[in-house]
């Protein structure tokens, strides 16, 4: 991160998948200046059916004045609205997807520090267990340990049995399981 910062750059952490590191490390300590978190992936908020989703953004203090405003600010145990000096202003009508963010906060408070510390470890453990089971039927795209997610490829099933990723996804839904992302490009 120091090389980027020395060149005048900023580091952005795509916290869409914090699952594997939650409770174990903090992106800000790794040198990242801006972090977003898709709450539905890590903190048990709804996302199905197109939303409502929520992706709060956290920044280092030197970027605070550039955040969209207004921001709730706590001064002397009283909350007020604060409009950052260099803000582009409001990004969303009213208060955004406030209830989704509140639900994530309640989930984190219920887990507590100890529960949050276990959250990442369990995400990795669950993904590795599931990948070992899935790989008995559908080969994994990569032969290496996964963290909180893995990619399976039905390329061979398509050739041998004309079964597509879409078919597997629909079969999972029929059995009551949420279908994973299908047709994920393996070049990512």
Regions found by a protein language model. Give the residues of each.
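Terminal amphipathic helices with adjacent charged low-complexity linkers/tails
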Residues: 137-168, 173-188
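Residues at alpha-helix termini
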Residues: 7, 30, 136-137, 175
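Conserved PLP phosphate-binding loop immediately N-terminal to the Schiff-base lysine helix
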Residues: 1, 8-45
């Amino acid at each position: 991160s120091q090389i980027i910062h020395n060149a005048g750059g900023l580091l952005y952490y795509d916290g869409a998948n914090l699952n594997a590191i939650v409770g174990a490390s903090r992106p800000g300590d790794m040198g990242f200046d801006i972090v977003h978190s898709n709450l539905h992936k890590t903190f048990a908020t709804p996302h199905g059916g197109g939303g409502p989703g929520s992706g709060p953004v956290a920044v280092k203090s030197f970027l605070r004045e550039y955040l969209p405003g207004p921001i709730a600010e706590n001064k002397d145990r009283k909350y007020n609205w604060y409009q950052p000096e260099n803000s582009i202003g409001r990004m969303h009508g009213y208060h955004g997807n406030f209830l989704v963010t509140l639900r994530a906060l309640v989930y984190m408070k219920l887990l507590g520090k100890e529960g949050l510390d276990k959250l990442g470890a369990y995400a990795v453990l669950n993904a590795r267990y599931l990948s070992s089971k899935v790989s008995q039927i559908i080969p994994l795209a990569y032969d290496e340990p996964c963290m909180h997610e893995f990619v399976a490829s039905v390329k061979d099933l398509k050739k041998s049995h004309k079964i597509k990723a879409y078919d597997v996804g629909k079969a999972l839904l029929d059995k009551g399981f949420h279908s994973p992302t299908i047709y994920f490009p393996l070049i990512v």
